[in-house]
């Protein structure tokens, strides 16, 4: 979809994913339904795990929750087919009728980032921003994964660790607390069957 979603035919989409066009229409009524599914795949797997993260991580250690959320989000964006996360910024996508549903799901994720971020942040950071602004900044820092993939580079476990740790440092989390979050999250990842998403190093 390098030419944009609007300029891409359903036949081209079918060829790209290796199925017949007729099979594509068996599952989707048209391009808008395909777009809706692609967008949801880039955000919904992470959103669906937010409640579990909050249940696993005590409120006093929210830096771990933020780090865990970032790692899971990185995995979602890394595993999204054909780097569909890159679609977010395309004008023909943002103007589509199905974008609103995706935007709602994405906002749930922004809210989670903002909530965990403020609970982790230093007093100075918390005083200078609100949850919505901080959530957007944190999420944008994670979405660099789509640019890395677009450039043809691999999102290695080491790179995932660095990106997730950078989110904590945006909140002015002390290095010692970052290290604790990294090691704790590495153990908690087994609860999500993501044992290989992180190597526990920064």
Q: How would you label these PLM feature ranges?
A:
Residues 71-78, 86-93, 166-172:
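Helix-loop "lid/cap" segments that line or gate small-molecule binding pockets
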Residues 47-51, 86-89, 94-122, 129-143, ...:
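Amphipathic alpha-helical packing segments from all-alpha helical-bundle domains
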Residues 84-89, 176-180:
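Short, hydrophobic secondary-structure boundary micro-motifs
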Residues 1-37:
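Helix-turn-helix
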Residues 111-122, 127, 144-202:
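C-terminal peripheral helix-coil segments that are non-catalytic and often amphipathic
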Residues 40-47:
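Short, basic, alpha-helical segments at the C-terminal edge of helix-turn-helix-like DNA-binding modules
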Residues 37, 51-79, 83, 138:
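Hydrophobic alpha-helical connector segments
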């Amino acid at each position: 979809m390098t030419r944009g979603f609007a300029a891409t035919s359903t036949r081209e989409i079918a060829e790209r994913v290796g199925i017949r066009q007729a099979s594509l229409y068996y599952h989707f009524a048209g391009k808008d339904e395909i777009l809706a599914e692609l967008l949801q795949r880039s955000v919904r797997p992470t959103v669906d795990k937010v409640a579990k993260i909050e249940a696993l991580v005590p409120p006093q250690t929210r830096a771990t929750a933020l780090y865990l959320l970032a790692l899971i989000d990185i995995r979602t964006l890394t595993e999204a087919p054909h780097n569909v996360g890159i679609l977010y910024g395309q004008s023909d996508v943002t103007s589509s009728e199905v974008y609103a549903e995706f935007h709602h799901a994405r906002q749930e994720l922004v809210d989670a980032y903002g909530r965990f971020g403020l609970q982790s942040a230093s007093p100075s950071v918390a005083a200078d921003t609100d949850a919505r602004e901080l959530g957007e900044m944190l999420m944008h820092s994670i979405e660099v994964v789509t640019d890395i993939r677009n450039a043809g580079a691999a999102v290695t476990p080491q790179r995932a660790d660095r990106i997730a740790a950078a989110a904590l440092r945006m909140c002015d989390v002390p290095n010692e607390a970052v290290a604790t979050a990294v090691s704790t999250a590495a153990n908690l990842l087994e609860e999500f069957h993501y044992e290989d998403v992180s190597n526990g190093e920064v």
